[in-house]
Amino acid sequence: MNDTTPVIIRQLGRQAYFPIWQAMQDFTDSRDSSSQDEIWLVEHDPVFTQGQAGKEEHLLAPGDIPVVKVDRGGQVTYHGPGQQMMYVLLNLKRHGLGVRTLVSALESCIVDTLKEYKVDAYPKADAPGVYVDNKKVCSIGLRIRRGCSFHGLALNVNMDLAPFQRINPCGYAGLEMVDCTQLGGPDSLAVAGPAIAEKLCSLLGIASVENKEGFDE
């Protein structure tokens, strides 16, 4: 990366899904070539999100958990407490990135983080995300608009995985989910969030970051 402008890493705490999705869209629509890139670390209240390719039959029994149809790639997944979301709001041209390269970097930042805990995680060529023993620990879904990315990844850290049984996760019937705590990996968002953000920046050649709490007033 040739640009020396710091990437902002924003710690947003626990938030409802819809306002953060709206903020991502507003940020992407209003940014220009001089806007700083940002990475958002956030934890969501329980919600199912249905991607652009989503099919209703994969929503088995959502019950009292709301379903939001969103503009990312992929099928249905679940977000909730104890899961680390990392949203990547990047100007792809600035970083010399193609979409596939960004997806690979997102997968690698999880694989590399878990490797430090002696957990053997891996991506799958035909099903984006990160897996351990055929169980999924991280889901990935992106949207590119005007050459800029938004959405990102969801890493199961220390959470109630039961809501995943109400759907076919990512469109795969019977796909088992797992979290980092079960694997002996990082057991809190306070540890996992900064670790994966640091790994991603390293993989993308981002040398300068600026850490912030919450949104600017």
From Swiss-Prot:
Listed PROSITE patterns: BPL_LPL_CATALYTIC (PS51733), LIPB (PS01313)
E.C. numbers: 2.3.1.181
First-level EC class: transferase
Sequence ranges assigned to domain BPL/LPL catalytic in this UniProt record: 33-208
Catalytic activity: octanoyl-[ACP] + L-lysyl-[protein] = N(6)-octanoyl-L-lysyl-[protein] + holo-[ACP] + H(+)
Alphabetized InterPro entries for the sequence: aa-tRNA-synth_II/BPL/LPL, BPL_LPL_catalytic, Octanoyltransferase, Octanoyltransferase_CS
One GO-annotated biological process of the protein: protein modification process
Active site (catalytic residues): 170 (acyl-thioester intermediate)
Subcellular location: Cytoplasm
Molecular function GO terms recorded: lipoyl(octanoyl) transferase activity
Matching SUPFAM superfamilies: Class II aaRS and biotin synthetases
UniProt site positions, description: Lowers pKa of active site Cys: 136
UniProt key word Transferase: yes
Note: In the reaction, the free carboxyl group of octanoic acid is attached via an amide linkage to the epsilon-amino group of a specific lysine residue of lipoyl domains of lipoate-dependent enzymes.
Biological role stated in the UniProt entry: Catalyzes the transfer of endogenously produced octanoic acid from octanoyl-acyl-carrier-protein onto the lipoyl domains of lipoate-dependent enzymes. Lipoyl-ACP can also act as a substrate although octanoyl-ACP is likely to be the physiological substrate.
Family affiliation: Belongs to the LipB family.
UniProt protein name: Octanoyltransferase
Lineage of producing organism: Bacteria, Pseudomonadati, Pseudomonadota, Gammaproteobacteria, Alteromonadales
Gene: lipB
